[in-house]
């Protein structure tokens, strides 16, 4: 009787069951990978949409303009200063936002202010909103809707101080140092086009000033001529002396002219050297100016590229690629593990 592991039918059944296991394992791994990648891509898309929404909101927020304004809180029906003035920070602010005006004030000991209402000259209640409520510092920042031209506001408050059993309601009036001014709209940065400086025009070498060459005065040699012998009727001895004197004079004259020519050459040589040195320095200055201007132009061209790169959103797509690679690696390792386990079982069955 043949052993069961040598039976062809048993072997085919084992192969089919092994293929089923491999197929099920591979399918489960692929399905899990797809689910993981889909969830990760949804998170990435949600983060990208949130970033874009924040950028759009920040771009759509209108620029607010403000101006400080002094004020004083006075008792009702008089110009005497009220104690309420000591519980408000000075100065206040006039704010223009979305074409609406607000008077902004900061209340000290905010826990004492149980109620506060503001009215205009026509006894109409003005809308009041809380901008900031700092519990630790016990301060509260409020905005009161106003209009340009308001000079005073009527206030009705309810103050409670538990430490001294103070609980009162009273009316005061808030007097501005000047009427609420009209503020200009804030400049929108998106509509302002940056002015690019024009590069300075360089002069061509032909337009540049030529170096001034110093004028050299030519030195004319002074020749002293000896007086001719007037007396032609002198004796022979005298005539010999006269000829000697003439020859000496001529030789002295030739020596002086040669020395004068040498001095002229010496004077002209340094003048030429100075002129050539000045021309070389001018050429170097022109080349330096050109190189500096080219560097400025390249920097100006690179600055808008850097600004455009700063405005780009972060590249969140790279994280999904990394996750996909890690998932594929994990699936490959799982598949190899299942195959090795299958081979190990087959060896044990044999």
UniProtKB/Swiss-Prot annotation:
Query: Looking at the record's lineage, which domain of life comes first?
Result: Bacteria
The keyword Heme is assigned to this record:
yes
Signal peptide stretch: 1-46
Q: Which family does it belong to?
A: Belongs to the IsdA family.
Function, please? Cell wall-anchored surface receptor that participates in the extraction of heme from oxidized methemoglobin/metHb to enable growth on hemoglobin as a sole iron source. Receives heme from IsdB and transfers it to IsdC. Also plays a role in the inhibition of host immune response. Protects S.aureus against the bactericidal protease activity of apolactoferrin. Decreases bacterial cellular hydrophobicity, which renders S.aureus resistant to bactericidal human skin fatty acids as well as to beta-defensins and cathelicidin.
Q: What is known of its domains?
A: The NEAT domain is responsible for binding Fe(3+) and Fe(2+) heme and fibrinogen. The NEAT domain is an inhibitor of apolactoferrin activity, while the C-domain confers resistance to bovine lactoferricin.
For this entry, the protein name equals Iron-regulated surface determinant protein A
Which species is this record about?
A: Staphylococcus aureus (strain bovine RF122 / ET3-1)
